[in-house]
Amino acid sequence: MEVFMYQINALNPKEEGHKARKRFGQNFLHDQRVIAKIVRSVNPRPGDNVVEIGPGLAALTSPLIGECDALTVVELDRDLAAGLPDRVPHPERLTIVEADALKYDFSQLATQESPLRVVGNLPYNISTPLLFHLLEFGDKVKDMHFMLQKEVVDRITAEPNTKEYGRLSVMIQYFCQPTFLFEVPAGAFNPPPKVTSAVFRLVPYKEKPIVAKDEKALSRLVGHVFTQRRKTLRNSLKGMLADDAFDKAGIDPMARPETLTLAQFVALSDQMVP
């Protein structure tokens, strides 16, 4: 699979002094209609605690900051971070955090009165670990809006009994309510990537509708069975569960992992916990 790092830029990258680099797979979003649609989906309001991950050349940052009292951006590239105040209206509203989002403690940006609204265009190669890193701060996050390759978004929002359904589907849906919002065609980027992208929303549950006894056990079980998704649960989980675990969980041991609901995965993982 090709990896594309999305940096939003409604202008000509060369005019901005930043050339798309092939080795990083950078593709710059130039379609103003798509940018406007993203902002409408986020629907920022004065008083919102908005955090943008990877602002790049600020094409999304600019319309966002026009709707907010304040905007915090997390940018790893020092050169891009240094140029942001000159690229946005109301630079006095902008707070720039030069940090690796994968390691950053987002809790320090939130308060009880102002949970985070996180926005970003995530490169595929860090999207999964970054999503799970952000979920560590789920109790401090109101919602998240991201753009990724459509196939990844399809996996996040997938339902049981589909080929897209897997570990990412189960674990994201355990913590959040995901919503597929809209596709972004390759032609919206310069240069155009070879994949279609999509924008989606995640809303962390304030109270999870289904709670596992041990979330690490759930993650371990789900990850294990989907690495062997063609095997039956009995064969895949041999040695991990007691003989009567399937009966206690009310699950057919001959089923395959893609047929199980989130609730069934939780019931099965609970059998791993004394």
Curated annotation (Swiss-Prot):
A GO CC term?
Answer: cytosol
Predominant cellular place of this UniProt entry's protein: cytoplasm
Q: Which SMART domains match?
A: rADc
> SUPFAM superfamilies annotated for this entry?
S-adenosyl-L-methionine-dependent methyltransferases
Which UniProt keyword terms apply here? Cytoplasm, Methyltransferase, RNA-binding, rRNA processing, S-adenosyl-L-methionine, Transferase
Q: Where in the cell is it found?
A: Cytoplasm
Q: Known InterPro entries for this protein?
A: KsgA/Erm (IPR001737), rRNA_Ade_diMease-like_C (IPR023165), rRNA_Ade_Mease_Trfase_CS (IPR020596), rRNA_Ade_methylase_Trfase_N (IPR020598), rRNA_adenine_dimethylase (IPR011530), SAM-dependent_MTases_sf (IPR029063)
Please, which domain of life does this record's source organism belong to?
A: Bacteria
What family is it from? Belongs to the class I-like SAM-binding methyltransferase superfamily. rRNA adenine N(6)-methyltransferase family. RsmA subfamily.
What is its biological role?
Answer: Specifically dimethylates two adjacent adenosines (A1518 and A1519) in the loop of a conserved hairpin near the 3'-end of 16S rRNA in the 30S particle. May play a critical role in biogenesis of 30S subunits.
Which named protein is this? Answer: Ribosomal RNA small subunit methyltransferase A
Species of provenance: Acinetobacter baylyi (strain ATCC 33305 / BD413 / ADP1)
